[in-house]
Amino acid sequence: MSKAGGNKGGSRTGGRGGAGSSNLHVRVKKKAGTTKESSRRWLERHLNDPYVHKSRQDGYRSRAAYKLIEINDRYNLLKKGQKIIDLGAAPGGWSQIAARIVGSTDENPQVVGIDYLHVDPLPGVILLEMDFLDDEAPQKLMDALGDKPDLVISDMAAPTTGHRRTDHLRTVHLCEVAADFAVSVLKPGGHFLTKTFQGGTENELLALLKQKFRSVHHVKPPASRAESVELYLLARDFKG
């Protein structure tokens, strides 16, 4: 349930063109009996990804930082003083971005993240190391935040099996659980952002969101690789 990326920084850093470019292309040599071809291709792509390079330069925990930055640049979801819950927070990027934009501090934390994977401490973020699917997780999140959230964000994705439909169904299930949580805790006027995969089985989820929010649509930020089936569902203006 860990997040595929990390974030931090001001509300309008990075942006669509912020990844930069490099003429240096890294090739990963194949050694017989050591590296699977698929793993070699992934590593080579990762090493040559401009968002990966920029995330290191900017101090973000991973390239997915730019996904939230780009979505926020377009839709202005994050605002000073908001309270945020981050589901599937590892390695901490989205919590990092949220904390900086809303002005969360250790003295007055306004961001709570949860993941069963360990997340290194982040300024202004309360981190719960537990599975969001555990029965007690929702209440622990609310107790830690101390108020209803203005925004619930989720970059959760089930571990991939290599079977596209299976991966899609498992991730959609996480989306549904996250959506059920969001509609049970959000403040009126709040927003919900969640990762999903293309696959055409989200009808029930979309129906729920359209019933509960005034605006629902898919978003694919530039930082999401073009060849990836990854999408984000953005539901805005919770009816309460």
From Swiss-Prot:
Comp. bias regions, Gly residues: 1-20
Using the UniProt record, give the first listed, main subcellular location: cytoplasm
Query: Active-site residues?
Result: 195 (proton acceptor)
- Methyltransferase as a keyword of this entry, yes or no, is yes
Detail which positions bind S-adenosyl-L-methionine: 92, 94, 115, 131, 155
| Residue span of region Disordered | 1-40
GO cellular component annotations of the record: cytoplasm
Is ATP-binding among the key words of this record?
Answer: no
Q: Which UniProt keywords apply?
A: Cytoplasm, Methyltransferase, rRNA processing, S-adenosyl-L-methionine, Transferase
Q: What is its EC number?
A: 2.1.1.166
Q: Where in the cell is it found?
A: Cytoplasm
| Catalytic activity reported | uridine(2552) in 23S rRNA + S-adenosyl-L-methionine = 2'-O-methyluridine(2552) in 23S rRNA + S-adenosyl-L-homocysteine + H(+)
GO terms assigned for molecular function: rRNA (uridine-2'-O-)-methyltransferase activity
User: What family is this protein classified in?
Assistant: Belongs to the class I-like SAM-binding methyltransferase superfamily. RNA methyltransferase RlmE family.
What is the role of the protein in this entry? Answer: Specifically methylates the uridine in position 2552 of 23S rRNA at the 2'-O position of the ribose in the fully assembled 50S ribosomal subunit.
**The protein, known as:** Ribosomal RNA large subunit methyltransferase E
